[in-house]
């Protein structure tokens, strides 16, 4: 009977039906691109592919832990109930491990979970590790499922699922991984609780929410779907870009929930945006904090630009900040990947105050430098406490720009004299004014850097990568430049926020501020 149970425990259970109703859009978010080659699991020792049930998912995700998996000799596969030889580690001796024969008819042990330090009594009196009862940590599960770095499955959830399975080292198929994520709770609206409305726009409503799975706060961007038109192109664009952008200074897209009536994007929750932060400071920020925020903006942008992704809608409302001071780029609804340099894009893309003059004058051929003008405007706003060019119309915006930086000429902006829109406006001939007169809190290095951002010719604007190396950031130390992309700058002990001079310890009331909050998340 024991031999029969032993044989039965080595067989694999049949596959369960998988719900294939999730859209390809949700699949692309939850499945990493580099796993697309793994259409089916690797067959080991002549076994068929594993099933797609939750139990087999757990089996497949217990292979890469701190200790190497134990390999089963072919004689055991054939039915022998002898001892197993563990693989050696670091040249140490082989440990003898006996199979735990107390198995249920479904091949699962009916004993409680054990850890790698648990011991069982061998018939020969040797103390042995029980290889079946290995405790899987949250880190193990997150790594194997490629979950976002700040998602943590609670310990209680691991215990509830009884994740204690023999180690398997074969990779998981896309199909099986998708089913596993769904069984955990991803892609389901019931996994999230709506707490309060943060804002509402033409196409989307944003809620503050909580994940039942992790107890973490989330931002739920609920996009209404019209049956005639389907998902707005901005939503599709945002999802397609964010699923590939994994960086400490870019907002994390945790999940996608697709129903017949809506598409809900589940983002990490950050308490406020840069506009709210400046309001809380009475628009008088610490210049040290200005430097930290500017560096993080550049760091996130440099990552995007290396991947030929343009944000195209930079503004304080699209820069989210948490309590630590970590700043993250958000709202990629107008962003797009730049694959062909000469490709013509729509020129209706950027909020007016942060729109560069070449776009204001009708240029639709641009590159990553389109974002750098907006960085300069935001830099000035943080340092001075007021918007740099708060124009109400395109003409008014250009008027404010030319009055400060000087009306461009053929010498200062080659080709401008032949621009029809520029000629039609017939602007007065303004002379440039010293920027230090308008931002007296900036030092000479800061003035030099902001000047590099505010160049009429887009190709002359400093890149995000180059700006990070500017002498203005020298006081932050050298280690900040060597951080991995996924690591926050606040992981360095020398990087800390300072108290802002104008900070007032006040917050928005519980109600009445929804329309002013998180406008960055709306279409």
UniProtKB/Swiss-Prot annotation:
<feature type="modified residue" description="Phosphoserine">
    <location>
        <position position="80"/>
    </location>
</feature>
<feature type="modified residue" description="Phosphoserine">
    <location>
        <position position="92"/>
    </location>
</feature>
<feature type="modified residue" description="Phosphoserine">
    <location>
        <position position="146"/>
    </location>
</feature>
<keyword id="KW-0597">Phosphoprotein</keyword>
<keyword id="KW-0808">Transferase</keyword>
<keyword id="KW-0723">Serine/threonine-protein kinase</keyword>
<comment type="similarity">
    <text>Belongs to the protein kinase superfamily. CMGC Ser/Thr protein kinase family. CDC2/CDKX subfamily.</text>
</comment>
<feature type="compositionally biased region" description="Polar residues">
    <location>
        <begin position="110"/>
        <end position="123"/>
    </location>
</feature>
<keyword id="KW-0418">Kinase</keyword>
<feature type="region of interest" description="Disordered">
    <location>
        <begin position="103"/>
        <end position="123"/>
    </location>
</feature>
<feature type="region of interest" description="Disordered">
    <location>
        <begin position="30"/>
        <end position="55"/>
    </location>
</feature>
<dbReference type="InterPro" id="IPR008271">
    <property type="entry name" value="Ser/Thr_kinase_AS"/>
</dbReference>
<dbReference type="InterPro" id="IPR050108">
    <property type="entry name" value="CDK"/>
</dbReference>
<keyword id="KW-0547">Nucleotide-binding</keyword>
<feature type="binding site">
    <location>
        <begin position="198"/>
        <end position="206"/>
    </location>
    <ligand>
        <name>ATP</name>
    </ligand>
</feature>
<feature type="domain" description="Protein kinase">
    <location>
        <begin position="192"/>
        <end position="473"/>
    </location>
</feature>
<comment type="function">
    <text>May play a role in terminally differentiated neurons. Has a Ser/Thr-phosphorylating activity for histone H1.</text>
</comment>
<dbReference type="GO" id="GO:0106310">
    <property type="term" value="F:protein serine kinase activity"/>
</dbReference>
<dbReference type="GO" id="GO:0005634">
    <property type="term" value="C:nucleus"/>
</dbReference>
<dbReference type="GO" id="GO:0005737">
    <property type="term" value="C:cytoplasm"/>
</dbReference>
<feature type="modified residue" description="Phosphoserine">
    <location>
        <position position="9"/>
    </location>
</feature>
<dbReference type="GO" id="GO:0006468">
    <property type="term" value="P:protein phosphorylation"/>
</dbReference>
<dbReference type="Pfam" id="PF00069">
    <property type="entry name" value="Pkinase"/>
</dbReference>
<feature type="region of interest" description="Disordered">
    <location>
        <begin position="501"/>
        <end position="523"/>
    </location>
</feature>
<dbReference type="GO" id="GO:0004672">
    <property type="term" value="F:protein kinase activity"/>
</dbReference>
<feature type="modified residue" description="Phosphoserine">
    <location>
        <position position="105"/>
    </location>
</feature>
<feature type="active site" description="Proton acceptor">
    <location>
        <position position="313"/>
    </location>
</feature>
<dbReference type="InterPro" id="IPR011009">
    <property type="entry name" value="Kinase-like_dom_sf"/>
</dbReference>
<feature type="compositionally biased region" description="Basic residues">
    <location>
        <begin position="514"/>
        <end position="523"/>
    </location>
</feature>
<dbReference type="InterPro" id="IPR000719">
    <property type="entry name" value="Prot_kinase_dom"/>
</dbReference>
<keyword id="KW-0067">ATP-binding</keyword>
<dbReference type="GO" id="GO:1901987">
    <property type="term" value="P:regulation of cell cycle phase transition"/>
</dbReference>
<feature type="modified residue" description="Phosphoserine">
    <location>
        <position position="137"/>
    </location>
</feature>
<dbReference type="GO" id="GO:0005524">
    <property type="term" value="F:ATP binding"/>
</dbReference>
<dbReference type="InterPro" id="IPR017441">
    <property type="entry name" value="Protein_kinase_ATP_BS"/>
</dbReference>
<feature type="binding site">
    <location>
        <position position="221"/>
    </location>
    <ligand>
        <name>ATP</name>
    </ligand>
</feature>
<protein>
    <recommendedName>
        <fullName>Cyclin-dependent kinase 17</fullName>
        <ecNumber>2.7.11.22</ecNumber>
    </recommendedName>
</protein>
<feature type="modified residue" description="Phosphoserine">
    <location>
        <position position="165"/>
    </location>
</feature>
<feature type="modified residue" description="Phosphoserine">
    <location>
        <position position="180"/>
    </location>
</feature>
<comment type="subunit">
    <text>Found in a complex containing CABLES1, CDK16 and TDRD7. Interacts with TDRD7.</text>
</comment>
<dbReference type="GO" id="GO:0004693">
    <property type="term" value="F:cyclin-dependent protein serine/threonine kinase activity"/>
</dbReference>
